[in-house]
């Protein structure tokens, strides 16, 4: 009998978690909360506007821990981090809400969004339409659909649910087969390429570069994971990839927003481009 991968363990626990959440708050109540939530802020548009100008469109992640690296940040105040990211030039935020493997929380998303004007993606493992409506109820502007965690029918159902409640969708792929499925099933403009293999948690930036030629020009590519230094950013920009999802490099920094500014907007000589100077 094979040993379950990290992703398989996460998905098994996620199914239990969704059942527990449904038992606590029924779908009708979550739908009521979703209808009364603040209007979406336009996650996809925020990224597309930057990328069209060939400026870094950074999704800055608020993540306390990960299964592979453990706790990334001891001093973890989501509102403070969100304001720091906004000042540093982020286009959007990503907030982990998975409790068991990433030490996330719904409250972190609420706190981060309330502290700034940036659109926010709920970073979690979506396997049930209930979670999509719940994402809108807690204030998310976008949800993540991970192709390796879903069959085509469920992926389409989740995307349709997202559209019905006004959420944008970032679809995430890791290889050619997943990309083919995503392009066939979904019409979202946002295609995330995760440089991390979710079964082994190994990272290679070549994943983005290898898949890039297969993606239609009308989709915006978001490179995810493994962007740690200026050379990594330049490697992507020379291939006309301008949208980035970055977490670890910022979470380990004393000032996450300052690290964002340094990594994406500061050229040699200290000149800052594209971000607010204050």
Swiss-Prot record:
Disulfide bonds: none
Domain of life the protein comes from: Bacteria
Catalytic activities: 1-(2-carboxyphenylamino)-1-deoxy-D-ribulose 5-phosphate + H(+) = (1S,2R)-1-C-(indol-3-yl)glycerol 3-phosphate + CO2 + H2O
Pathway(s): Amino-acid biosynthesis; L-tryptophan biosynthesis; L-tryptophan from chorismate: step 4/5
Alphabetized SUPFAM superfamilies for the sequence: Ribulose-phoshate binding barrel
EC annotation from Swiss-Prot or TrEMBL: 4.1.1.48
InterPro entries in the cross-refs: Aldolase_TIM (IPR013785), Indole-3-glycerol_P_synth (IPR045186), Indole-3-glycerol_P_synth_dom (IPR013798), Indole-3-GlycerolPSynthase_CS (IPR001468), RibuloseP-bd_barrel (IPR011060)
Keyword Protease set for record: no
PROSITE patterns linked to this entry: IGPS
Keyword terms: Amino-acid biosynthesis, Aromatic amino acid biosynthesis, Decarboxylase, Lyase, Tryptophan biosynthesis
One BP term from GO: L-tryptophan biosynthetic process
GO molecular function, one term: indole-3-glycerol-phosphate synthase activity
Family label: Belongs to the TrpC family.
Name of the protein: Indole-3-glycerol phosphate synthase
Species of origin: Pseudomonas paraeruginosa (strain DSM 24068 / PA7)
Gene name tied to this protein: trpC
């Amino acid at each position: 009998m094979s040993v379950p991968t990290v992703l398989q363990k996460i998905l098994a626990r996620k199914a239990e978690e969704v059942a527990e959440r449904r038992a606590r708050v029924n779908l009708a109540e979550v739908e009521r909360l979703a209808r009364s939530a603040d209007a979406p802020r336009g996650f996809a548009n925020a990224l597309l506007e930057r990328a069209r100008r060939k400026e870094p469109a950074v999704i800055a992640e608020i993540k306390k821990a990960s299964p592979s690296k453990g706790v990334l940040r001891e001093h973890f105040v989501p509102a403070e981090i969100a304001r720091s990211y906004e000042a540093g030039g982020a286009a959007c935020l990503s907030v982990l809400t998975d409790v068991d493997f990433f030490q996330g929380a719904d409250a972190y998303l609420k706190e981060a969004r309330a502290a700034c004007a940036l659109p926010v993606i709920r970073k979690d493992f979506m396997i049930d339409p209930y979670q999509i409506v719940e994402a809108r109820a807690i204030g998310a502007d976008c949800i993540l659909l991970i192709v390796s965690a879903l069959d085509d029918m469920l992926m389409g159902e989740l995307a349709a649910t997202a559209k019905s409640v006004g959420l944008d969708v970032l679809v995430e792929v890791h290889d050619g087969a997943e990309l083919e499925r995503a392009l066939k099933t979904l019409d979202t403009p946002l295609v995330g390429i995760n440089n991390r293999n979710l079964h082994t948690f190994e990272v290679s930036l070549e994943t983005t570069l290898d898949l890039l030629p297969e993606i239609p020009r009308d989709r915006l590519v978001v490179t995810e994971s493994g962007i740690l230094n200026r050379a990594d950013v330049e490697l992507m920009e020379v291939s006309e990839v301008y949208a980035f999802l970055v977490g670890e490099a910022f979470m380990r920094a004393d000032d996450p927003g300052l690290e964002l500014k340094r990594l994406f907007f500061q050229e040699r000589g200290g000149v800052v481009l594209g971000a607010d100077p204050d």
